[in-house]
């Protein structure tokens, strides 16, 4: 792109003009020194300022010629590389070159704008030409805002001017609408521009006729002509004179009104001495004037003398306007009109004083005749014009000959002598005709050529003070001011805003001066505003002046729109060009990258080929090595395969041999198994044969024993017949012996022939009976002569009813004392006998541990008593655990169909121990039985104190946790022991009173004779409910059962794991549960232990001398004691009975001391009811609704076995 021409300034003003540096990076990074550019041979040395590199912060100036002076007239610009260049200005030929360059530039601009207009589409053209009324007035308002004084007075003056202009616009538009009803704002504006182009203001009739006569394409052609005319600036130049004259007239009107009011001058104009001289005209303005020459100067401009043109330009800058464009326009207009040129010559030579004097003389001569204010009177006829010329010449010559030459300090004469408004109007008309170049002005100039130049210059300077304001309208005429693409690298260098900058500076100075002139008359402006347009200028003149202003505004709007469109189009082209260049640059980069890539690809391909060759060579080597390795591996594999086959063959042979051996071993094992099975079969057969033989032997033994018993019975009968008297003497002793014997024997193994009622109904007699049972059965059969044989054993209840109704139930055991050993229990034993129900679970799972202590005898007994008690019991202390085990095995053979009966009741007590000689005689046995009863003090129990008292209280335990043993003591309907408590329901008795039986040998006594109790004590309120033969056994059994419960409870408290406990400690604990400790002797305690041992429910240990020291109860015994079967449902047919004395002679129903009531746990099995009693049952107190006693009204089913000692 080309470089812009540098801006030229003169004097002390320096203008910097920076050309666009190259966009290349190399030119910015490198340091280059610019060489001096020689425009003319006489140019002065240059001063170059070299910019430092980007890294340096402070640039340094370097002088090429240090001795040369810094030029006063210079041009400063920037070189392509960024260096600042200061050049000396050649005053001689710089203006002509600049003028030519400016003409060429403007010519290029016009041609480009015309080409752009022709390239636009119709829509775009219509868009540019569509100018609204608001846009027109916005131009004038913006001009007033930017270029006029900002004071309040000026602002108020602008409002009526704008209103007047708007009214003029509306009138013109209405006139156009009257001429052409289809006219709009666009067509109206185009017509105004067309009139401006033609230089005439034709009437409405001519415009209407021209529009109708032309074709449809006339509007488009008119648009093109109007736009091209606006581009050429010719119309603007033509209207500028009228606008200047209009403003000048307005200022003169204000001044005349003020003079009428005899006020000091409002505007203080500068004297000619304040203006710069012609010699001091800045050369920058002369150059700038050359830049603003229009394209339509005409052919005369090239022929004008350059020196004369320079002189006129200096004069115009000094007196007309300091703005270069206005001065240039003035010179151009002066060269076009000879009259104006003659006036300028007069002003230059004699300062224009002759012309001013001539005008003053002419005005003064016409004061008597008023000058009409209408525009028609301002037009002179030929005779009037000639007369005016004569008078002006004569007056001017007279005044110049008589008046001296005025100094520069004298005020202008036209400002002081002209007082009347009509004179002013005439002067303005004449000045207007002079500016139009009429003949009267030419003659005046010719007559004044020889006058004083200084006076003329002074007059012209005063007259032209208002001219700088006229230049304000030319700001927007230069269409190059609003377009500046200096920074763009794609600028076409069409426009130059340096002229606009200098023009703005001059405008600022002028506005400042204009504002100072109005500082003194702000208070006067308000009175003058009412008379703005009250002059004699008629409506037509105002319309013409307004038309010119509107035409200028429309022209500027069209120029702006066209320039904006051109700029947009150019910007779009620049963007496209930028995109194209960017694409080209990117393409170049891509090409470079592709070249580099191709080069790299070639290098890579070459390297790859070399690598492939190396790899191929290496691969061949590897393949050769692999082939050799494979051959070696194949040979090795072949060798291993042969070796594997050999090993497999050897292994196969070995497996075959092993299989044969295993097969042989299996056959041997099968043979052994067959032989073993044969042996087992033989052994089983032998066992069966042995069992058969044993069964036969047992049967033979039973037959033998039966025969022996029969022989004994026969012998006993024979002895009874032989000794009737002896039997009567020993009746009482034998009665006691039988009771003691039955007490120990019937608790475990009741006799089969006696209707106890406590053996289960369906229970058969055990096959393995002891010898003692047989002996006692024989004795019972011998003594029971009067008992009927019709009583049945299976359905009769127990004959211990008298004892059962006062029997002592089991006592609960306190769970808090389970974990205590016997030593702690002995130290602190509970006084009241009250134990919870759940002790059974703890005792049933307790481990057995032996706790043995060596105590010589029970505490509280003398050694003699203990020794005698043990010594007087034959056959007991010699027992050993072996015998106990033997007896236990014998007892276990007995089974019940509905469950097991507790051990203390199903065991058979043997009075004679385990080793009883079957060959003993009956008399010996009877003697032993008597001695045992005597030693155990049962012979005098009628007078002894009871063991303990039984409490009848029923409030100790809840009702739901109690139970009874059952209907009877050994009821066949219960799986366990029946309740020791009578639970039959009370009812009316239907039986006759029974007589007590006095002796067990009394066979003549009736079976219905019952004793009140075991010892024959009767009571008035006692009702016997059992025969006397059965009372003794029942009472003994109840006594034994209650004592057994006390012993078991004491043992449970001492041993929680089922181990051995010293009997002396156990006896002391038993006494702690009794209220009357003297009723339960140590001999009775030992007897209970022996009875339990014979029933295999207790184990005892003896010392070296055969005395028992320790005992232990088995777990089944503990469980059977704590768990009792439920009472069988059903009522009893027995009548209600009175409370009677029990075994220990205490009234059961009225006793309040002794043991507390305890619950009895029960389970229902078999055919018994599952209902559990819910009430707490007191000891010795039966519950209502049930009965545990035998119904004595029943007949015995086996009369043959009813003949025993119990009847």
UniProtKB/Swiss-Prot annotation:
- Region Disordered: start and end of each range? 1-58, 248-284, 398-420, 451-535, 586-735, 1124-1148, 1163-1183
Residues annotated as coiled-coil are 564-727
Compositional bias segments (type: Acidic residues): 469-507
| Assigned keywords, A-Z | Coiled coil, Cytoplasm, Stress response
The primary location reported for this protein is cytoplasm
Q: Which GO terms describe its cellular component?
A: P-body
Q: Where in the cell is it found?
A: Cytoplasm
Q: Which GO terms describe its biological process?
A: negative regulation of translation; response to salt stress
UniProt biased composition (Basic and acidic residues): 586-721
Cite the record's Polar residues compositional bias ranges. Answer: 7-16
Described function: May act as a negative regulator of salt tolerance.
Name the record gives this protein: Stress response protein NST1
**Which protein family is it in?**
Belongs to the NST1 family.
Q: What segments bear the compositional bias annotation Basic residues?
A: 25-36, 511-523
Residue stretches of biased makeup (Low complexity): 252-262, 1163-1176
Which is an annotated Pfam family here?
A: NST1
């Amino acid at each position: 792109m080309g470089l812009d021409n540098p801006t030229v300034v003169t004097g002390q003003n320096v203008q910097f003009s920076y050309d666009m540096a190259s966009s290349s990076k190399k030119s910015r990074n490198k340091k280059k020194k610019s060489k001096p550019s020689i425009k003319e041979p006489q140019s002065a040395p240059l001063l170059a300022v070299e910019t430092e590199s980007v890294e340096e912060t402070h640039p340094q100036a370097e002088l090429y010629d240090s001795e040369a002076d810094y030029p006063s007239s210079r041009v400063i610009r920037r070189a392509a590389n960024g260096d600042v260049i200061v050049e000396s200005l050649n005053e001689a030929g710089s203006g002509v070159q600049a003028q030519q360059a400016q003409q060429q530039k403007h010519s290029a601009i016009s041609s480009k704008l015309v080409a752009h207009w022709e390239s636009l589409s119709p829509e775009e053209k219509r868009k540019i030409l569509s100018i609204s009324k608001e846009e027109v007035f916005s131009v004038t308002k913006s001009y007033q805002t930017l270029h006029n004084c900002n004071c309040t007075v000026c602002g108020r003056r602008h409002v009526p001017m704008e209103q007047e202009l708007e009214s003029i616009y509306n009138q013109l538009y209405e006139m156009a609408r009257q001429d052409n009803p289809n006219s709009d704002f666009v067509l109206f504006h185009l017509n105004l521009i067309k009139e401006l182009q033609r230089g005439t203001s034709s009437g409405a009739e001519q415009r209407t006729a021209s529009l109708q006569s032309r074709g449809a394409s006339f509007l488009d052609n008119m648009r093109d002509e109007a736009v091209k005319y606006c581009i050429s600036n010719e119309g603007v130049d033509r209207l500028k004179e009228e606008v200047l004259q209009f403003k000048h007239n307005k200022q003169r009107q204000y001044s005349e009104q003020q003079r009428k009011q005899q006020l000091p001058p409002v505007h203080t104009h500068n004297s000619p001495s304040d203006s710069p001289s012609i010699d001091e005209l800045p050369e920058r303005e002369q150059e700038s004037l050359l830049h603003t020459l229009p394209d339509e100067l005409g052919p005369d401009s090239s022929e004008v003398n350059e020196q004369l043109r320079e002189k006129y330009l200096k004069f115009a800058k000094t007196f007309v306007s300091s703005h270069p464009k206005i001065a240039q326009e003035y010179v151009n207009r002066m060269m076009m009109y000879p009259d104006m040129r003659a006036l300028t010559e007069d002003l230059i030579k004699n300062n224009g004083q002759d012309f001013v004097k001539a005008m003053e003389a002419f005005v003064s001569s016409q004061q008597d005749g008023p000058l009409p204010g209408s525009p028609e009177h301002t037009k002179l006829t030929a005779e009037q014009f000639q007369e005016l010329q004569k008078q002006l010449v004569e007056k001017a010559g007279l005044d110049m000959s008589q008046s001296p030459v005025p100094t520069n300090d004298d005020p202008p004469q036209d400002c002081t002598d002209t007082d009347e408004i009509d004179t002013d109007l005439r002067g303005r008309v004449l000045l207007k005709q002079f500016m139009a170049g009429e003949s009267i002005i030419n003659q005046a100039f010719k007559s004044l050529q020889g006058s004083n130049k200084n006076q003329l210059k002074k007059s012209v300077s005063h007259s032209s003070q208002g001219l700088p304001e006229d230049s304000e309208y030319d700001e927007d005429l230069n269409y190059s001011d609003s377009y500046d693409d200096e920074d763009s690298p794609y600028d076409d260098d069409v426009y130059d805003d340096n002229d606009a900058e200098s023009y703005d500076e001059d405008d600022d100075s002028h506005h400042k001066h204009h504002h100072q002139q109005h500082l003194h008359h702000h208070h006067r402006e308000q009175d003058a505003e009412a008379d703005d347009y009250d002059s004699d200028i008629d409506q037509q003149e105002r319309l013409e002046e307004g038309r010119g202003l509107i035409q200028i505004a429309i022209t500027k709007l069209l120029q702006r729109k066209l320039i904006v469109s051109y700029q947009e189009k150019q910007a779009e082209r620049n963007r496209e060009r930028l995109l194209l260049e960017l694409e080209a640059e990117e393409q170049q980069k891509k090409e470079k990258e592709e070249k580099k890539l191709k080069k790299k690809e070639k290098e890579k391909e070459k390297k790859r080929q070399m690598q492939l060759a190396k790899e191929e060579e290496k691969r061949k080597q590897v393949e050769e090595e692999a082939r050799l390795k494979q051959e070696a591996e194949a040979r090795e594999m072949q060798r291993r395969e042969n070796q594997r086959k050999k090993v497999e063959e050897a292994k196969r042979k070995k497996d075959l041999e092993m299989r044969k051996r295993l097969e042989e071993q299996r056959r041997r094992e099968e043979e052994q198994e067959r032989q073993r099975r044969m042996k087992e079969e033989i052994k089983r057969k032998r066992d069966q044969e042995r069992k058969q033989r044993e069964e036969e032997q047992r049967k033979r033994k039973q037959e033998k024993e039966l025969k022996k018993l029969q022989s004994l019975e026969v012998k006993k009968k024979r002895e009874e017949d032989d000794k009737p008297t002896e039997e009567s003497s020993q009746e009482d002793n034998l009665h006691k012996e039988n009771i003691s014997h039955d007490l120990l024997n019937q608790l475990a193994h009741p006799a089969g022939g006696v209707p106890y009622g406590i053996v289960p109904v369906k229970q058969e007699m055990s096959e393995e009976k002891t010898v003692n049972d047989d002996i006692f059965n024989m004795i019972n059969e011998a003594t029971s002569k009067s008992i009927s044989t019709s009583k049945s054993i299976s359905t009769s209840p127990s004959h211990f009813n008298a004892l059962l109704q006062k029997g002592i139930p089991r006592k609960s055991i306190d769970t808090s004392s389970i974990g205590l050993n016997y030593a702690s229990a002995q130290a602190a034993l509970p006084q009241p006998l009250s134990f919870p129900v759940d002790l059974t679970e703890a005792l049933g799972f307790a481990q057995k541990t032996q706790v043995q202590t060596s105590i010589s005898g029970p505490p509280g007994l003398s050694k003699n008593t203990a020794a005698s008690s043990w010594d007087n019991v034959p056959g007991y202390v010699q027992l050993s655990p072996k015998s106990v085990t033997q007896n236990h095995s014998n007892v276990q053979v007995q089974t019940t169909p509905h469950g097991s009966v507790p051990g203390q009741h199903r065991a058979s007590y043997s009075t004679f121990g385990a080793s009883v000689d079957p060959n003993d005689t009956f008399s010996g046995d009877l003697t032993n039985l008597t001695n045992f009863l005597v030693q155990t003090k049962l012979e005098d129990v009628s007078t002894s104190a009871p063991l303990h008292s039984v409490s009848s209280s029923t409030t100790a335990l809840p009702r739901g946790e109690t139970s009874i043993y059952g209907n009877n003591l050994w009821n066949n309907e219960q799986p366990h022991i029946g309740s020791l408590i009578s639970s039959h329901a009370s009812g009316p008795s239907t039986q006759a009173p029974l007589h007590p039986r006095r002796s067990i040998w009394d066979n003549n006594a009736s079976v219905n004779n019952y004793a009140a109790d075991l010892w024959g004590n009767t009571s008035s309120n006692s009702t016997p409910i059992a025969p006397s033969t059965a009372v003794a056994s029942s009472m003994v059994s109840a006594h034994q059962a209650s004592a057994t419960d006390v012993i078991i409870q004491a043992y449970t408290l001492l041993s929680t794991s089922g181990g051995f406990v010293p009997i002396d400690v156990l006896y002391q604990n038993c006494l702690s549960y009794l209220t009357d400790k003297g009723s339960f002797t140590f001999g009775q305690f030992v007897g209970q232990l022996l009875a339990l041992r014979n029933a295999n429910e207790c184990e005892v240990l003896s010392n070296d001398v055969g005395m028992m020291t320790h005992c232990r109860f088995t777990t089944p015994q503990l469980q059977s004691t704590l768990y009792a079967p439920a009472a069988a449902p059903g009522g009893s047919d027995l009548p209600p009975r009175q409370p009677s004395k029990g075994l220990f002679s205490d009234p059961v129903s009225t006793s309040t001391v002794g043991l507390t009531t305890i619950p009895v746990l029960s389970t229902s099995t078999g055919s018994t009811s599952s209902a559990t009693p819910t009430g707490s049952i007191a000891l010795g107190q039966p519950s209502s609704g049930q009965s545990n006693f035998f119904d004595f009204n029943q007949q015995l089913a086996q009369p043959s076995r009813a003949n025993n000692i119990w009847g």
